[in-house]
């Protein structure tokens, strides 16, 4: 008898989903300490049960395919398959569910974030049974975390290298981000560092354009660093962006920065790729360079609430791949960032052991097994009036970057840097004395203005500047 073949467009799709549930939905499964765990926010297509979708996610991101194949009998699928072991509805949302999937550790190459992401956030995100899918969190087990080098140096080693303790670090992105000549760029770097900043920074899209080739920029910036260090007696740095069209060119630029003796370089880890970033992090560990990481392109991936990858996952990926700094949002500036959610992934970047806390978006307890921490970078639309909130939110182990908030000072770059340095030290001193910066931060800034005309001028310029938009990224 010849079997009947269904030719309707949806028939094969339905059959495939039903097959997944039989094998990959296992609510009785006991999670192992070595499993990599994922929390997915699923929006099923109309009429598709969440159990079928959860099973499809587990299957398509591990061993499954759309039909039964004879080679299944040549291996142990029970050993290697992903398993959807729990599904819960999302409160306040229609037809959205959190699916928890456990993956055996043997599915992934040791020390490879690229391989991890290729499986977990690969083809499954285009699966027809799902209207939308978002990876909310990952649990990296100690057995897998220990296969990674992680950040080249970490927070404490960075402080030892630059000899700065007891306060947050201050930075500034040079503006305009594009169009300056190398010499004028170096001049702006020098003025900001001399004025009191710890770091200045290339913008993420500064690479090697016709108006400013990378080697010229590196040379003038190195001169600015050495001159400002000689005049202030402090160790200074500039995040030289080594991101390039090829990995070979990237490493060439990193080596030039090392030869010039600068302390830190920069990389755009999402646009350049995780493999390139891991190679660069290993190089920085070997040569003593600090590595600043920019997250350009992240909002394309993480901003929508129901589809993509949450930034806490991208932050975990960076901690595995390697970076000493990572931009993390500000809560109070011009860029997206809700307070509790931001603090949740900031803790995942800095701390060694983080407890599960759904109120902050942390779905799993994470043990980093002494992997070095990543310093969060707050940047984007911040100025001196934001300083109390930034100190209260981020504490000391953070880099606060004021681009326009430094270079937009009416008296120039160096006074802008001085205003930020005075504001930071005033807020830090007040906090250490027991002042509640959330309630009395404005009074602290106003009091400091009496002793700093640069700060007073900055406060006058930016007293009315606010970015009061409702955040999209909510729990």
From Swiss-Prot:
SUPFAM superfamilies in alphabetical order: RuBisCo, C-terminal domain, RuBisCO, large subunit, small (N-terminal) domain
Cellular component, GO, one term: chloroplast
Residue numbers of N-acetylproline PTMs: 3
Propeptide stretch(es), residue numbers: 1-2
A Pfam family: RuBisCO_large
Residues annotated as the enzyme's active site: 175 (proton acceptor), 294 (proton acceptor)
Site (Transition state stabilizer): 334
Top-level EC class as recorded in UniProt: lyase
Cofactor, how bound (note): Binds 1 Mg(2+) ion per subunit.
Function: RuBisCO catalyzes two reactions: the carboxylation of D-ribulose 1,5-bisphosphate, the primary event in carbon dioxide fixation, as well as the oxidative fragmentation of the pentose substrate in the photorespiration process. Both reactions occur simultaneously and in competition at the same active site.
SUBUNIT field: Heterohexadecamer of 8 large chains and 8 small chains.
Note: The basic functional RuBisCO is composed of a large chain homodimer in a 'head-to-tail' conformation. In form I RuBisCO this homodimer is arranged in a barrel-like tetramer with the small subunits forming a tetrameric 'cap' on each end of the 'barrel'.
Protein name: Ribulose bisphosphate carboxylase large chain
Species, as recorded: Stigeoclonium helveticum
